[in-house]
């Protein structure tokens, strides 16, 4: 910095003063999620299960889940039981509900939401509750790429909102869950 601003030694001094005033202790290895409390008073895990089975029924009715000999109802139910078990065991029912909440809200107010991408598309539960629109059974996608007991880092859903209404979706999350529980993360790809 001294090389960039040789005529302004106060810039270096002021930068050092600002750095000295900054104090934040990061707690690594701890996940800090807001709480999701279903309005109906159900426990989060039970509510996620209800949404999942309601979603299965709705998707069968609207034709986005087609039951046949390769994928009968019991195959869907078995996968649901497995996923809900892992989600519950790892303590992520509220995480699913938070993502469901803001995706559901966006769709309700007409904000276009992408169909899903990344490893989150491997979750049948995510499909059935409307976080994604990709049937992981039909496309042989692995739930374990998204969430498994050996995974040490928190999973994340890649959610795409329409660029000109994205701010509305983010404002909803900030308002409902608080500024201190809201962040935006983006990766920029380059050809370099």
Predicted regions and their residues:
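Phosphodiester-processing cores and adjacent nucleic acid-binding clamps
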Residues: 1-192
